[in-house]
């Protein structure tokens, strides 16, 4: 066991481990230590200032789920965009679950929209489930507000997949698009442009959202 792994096991919460493992059926429970996210985030902040952190980021793949989450948190702290994107590209193929994939994006992405948009398009076109999901997450987080264009919805909505975690992200994206860009997103529901499963899940998520008005929710229920 490495020194880092020993430190992570000191932060273990076995009750949390049992609960969180049940939410990730594709991840071996033996690969989950059981460190709560706020605790791991505090650890990452201190760990990022050590030489051990730089070495750790070169040692892929990692053994534990928490090591992968720690890696993502370390990437998110990198302020230099070129270095950040380089580390992101190296790590994305190693993501093996939705929870690691959906951790907050690096803040420097927000200041480099032109480049990150092109990379998001490439990631969405990837064959790998979580690289594809990550690209969709970028579009959802960074391109549904002031930088939105109608054609961006098609980038995500146009993806056809049999993968549960890809389809779930499409639905999450569509529900968010309905909340933020109703006029551009609603035709995809009205005209049933999505697969049946994604269509229904998008409506479900939108109806559950506090950002959708009661009138919009009633209208969406009629489109099920």
Region locations from a protein language model:
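Alpha-helical scaffold domains
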Residues: 1-224
